Amino acid sequence: MEMRNTTPDFILLGLFNHTRAHQVLFMMLLATVLTSLFSNALMILLIHWDHRLHRPMYFLLSQLSLMDMMLVSTTVPKMAADYLTGNKAISRAGCGVQIFFLPTLGGGECFLLAAMAYDRYAAVCHPLRYPTLMSWQLCLRMTMSSWLLGAADGLLQAVATLSFPYCGAHEIDHFFCEAPVLVRLACADTSVFENAMYICCVLMLLVPFSLILSSYGLILAAVLLMRSTEARKKAFATCSSHVAVVGLFYGAGIFTYMRPKSHRSTNHDKVVSAFYTMFTPLLNPLIYSVRNSEVKEALKRWLGTCVNLKHQQNEAHRSR
């Protein structure tokens, strides 16, 4: 009979050890995360500050940046604190919080990316009807639905995962609490939960991904009909980069949540999880925003305003 551990805590074994190579990787990862937080925060600031960006497309981008910032903040602070202090314990409640927020934000982002693909389809394929096809009311509904559907998935995963009894040393070979990893420690039959989670993943991952591919397929068909070679190249480059980032994000999610149990590897899980929780949030603002000419112009205007304000403050200080 398997012994059940009565301690309320779990132990996160982490992503890094204390070798020189891993210390360098840890510092590089922190730099990546800080860059990601800064770039996403800047995106939200610009969209809020510049009235020219007060359009559905940029509102969706601001929500994507907010989700990315929250996704990074859910996992990295705890991971960094564990590595620096050596205290790798996490309470059952803390584990539940991570399990809730990861599907909430990851699932919400899946639906939000589908909404953004629809927005691009409406703008490219039906530019004259765009205000009707992508009204503010529809934009807000899609955004709210993305958050609520993600939260529903997160709540179900957190409640179901923490309802199982856990055995052994409560050691989680990961750097944060994730449902597919945690249920491996359960000393109970988890097959019903795993089947339910697979069905959820079909709805949360494959359905939005199919909608995105369909939208970009229609966009590509419209792009090929453009008369201007330069416009065609620009649109194709933009669409291909969007599809590449979307494919990486969904691919990581499908690999983590829909892979057969017999093919699971803790090392692979950690690498893929690090990618979609830390590196994808950095790629999103770079691909969706920084390459956008309107965002670049907004950034120039904002920097110019900051310089002028600083100059005025210096002049006022000198006149005293």
Curated annotation (Swiss-Prot):
Q: Which Gene3D superfamilies match?
A: Rhodopsin 7-helix transmembrane proteins
Glycosylated residue positions: 17
Query: Membrane side Extracellular: which residues?
Result: 1-23, 78-98, 157-193, 258-270
What Pfam family is a match for this entry? 7tm_4
- Gene Ontology CC annotation, any one: plasma membrane
Q: How does it sit in the membrane?
A: Multi-pass membrane protein
**Single biological process term from Gene Ontology:** detection of chemical stimulus involved in sensory perception of smell
Keyword annotations for this protein, in alphabetical order, are:
Cell membrane, Disulfide bond, G-protein coupled receptor, Glycoprotein, Membrane, Olfaction, Receptor, Sensory transduction, Transducer, Transmembrane, Transmembrane helix
User: Which domain of life, per UniProt?
Assistant: Eukaryota
GO molecular function, a single term: G protein-coupled receptor activity
Q: Which PROSITE patterns match?
A: G_PROTEIN_RECEP_F1_1, G_PROTEIN_RECEP_F1_2
Keyword RNA-binding listed: no
Q: Which InterPro entries match?
A: GPCR_Rhodpsn, GPCR_Rhodpsn_7TM, Olfact_rcpt
Tell me where the transmembrane regions lie.
Answer: 24-47, 56-77, 99-118, 138-156, 194-217, 235-257, 271-290
* SS bonds (residue pairs): 95-187
Presence of keyword Transmembrane: yes
Where, in residue ranges, is this chain on the Cytoplasmic side? 48-55, 119-137, 218-234, 291-320
Q: Where is this protein localized, as stated in its record?
A: Cell membrane
Please describe what this protein does: Odorant receptor.
Q: Which family does it belong to?
A: Belongs to the G-protein coupled receptor 1 family.
Protein name (database record): Olfactory receptor 2T12
Source organism of this protein record: Homo sapiens (Human)
> What does the record give as the organism's lineage?
Eukaryota, Metazoa, Chordata, Craniata, Vertebrata
